[in-house]
Amino acid sequence: MVRVWNYSKASPQTTILPALVRYPNFEARTQCEVLKINLDKSGKRATGVTYVDTSGNEWEQPADLVLLCAFQLFNVQLLLLSGIGKPYDPNTGEGVIGRNYSYQVTSSVDAFFDNKVFNPFIASGSIGMCIDEFNGDNFDHGPHGFVGGGYLGAVQTNGRPIQSTRTPKGTPRWGLGWKQAVAKNYLTSYQVVTHGGCCSYRDAYCDLDPTYTDRFGRKLMRITFDFHENELKMSQYLTDRLAEVAQKMGPRQFEKKPRTAPTTLRFTRRHIPAAARSWAPIPRAAR
């Protein structure tokens, strides 16, 4: 187990909570989940929260001040479930809660070598180098027909034997041929990446799912989103520049993987630029 004592990892469990637990008037109730924000009779002021513990018991915690400090999507879900603010309506453009959802635009180039060993298992989240010349307004967008941009990066974060295994195009999906390709390319392949911004659009938003519920019977969060022409053009341009870098590395083979649409994503990432307009007209005590 590695303990980080220099507070370089800016997460609540490593920076905020260790400082708060020293105070006698602070209590951390772990493994509990807030179900809703409670409001007064006027519906204009938060009075506390209702939460459930590991035994399934519901508790009400009164409060003069309620802070929404969960992950962004859970904050939006709590606002919608609690009846706080006006839900966004994509048909009229009215409402703020769930509005302005945007994502990230990533792409990659897989490069396969014969004479280079990368040892992907020697990695961390901060090992890498980036080219920032194609980010934001760092270059002339005029001839390209899109706004925005992103970085070109060589970032080695992990060497997981399944999820991070790369095989060249034409490799069988299973069997002896696949095993041979994995054995040949695991140490000698590398993926360079792009990571770009994404605009907010009227047809991209979060709302409550009309069909599916969680284990408490609450409506799940639903995300309606796809990439637009601007992001697709940007991804193609960045990926082409990235391929030029990869080609200079001298691989025997490389494959470009720009972002395409339509797409269906299983949400796994934590990079969400927006999911609710700031600030929404919510009760003062719930901010």
Task: Tell where the protein language model's regions lie, with residue ranges.
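FAD cofactor-binding and catalytic pocket of flavoenzymes
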Residues: 94-221, 229, 267-275, 281-285
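Glycine- and acidic
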Residues: 1-4, 62, 219-229
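Conserved redox-cofactor binding core of oxidoreductases
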Residues: 1-34, 264-269
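Non-transmembrane alpha-helical segments in soluble domains
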Residues: 17, 76-80, 239, 243-246
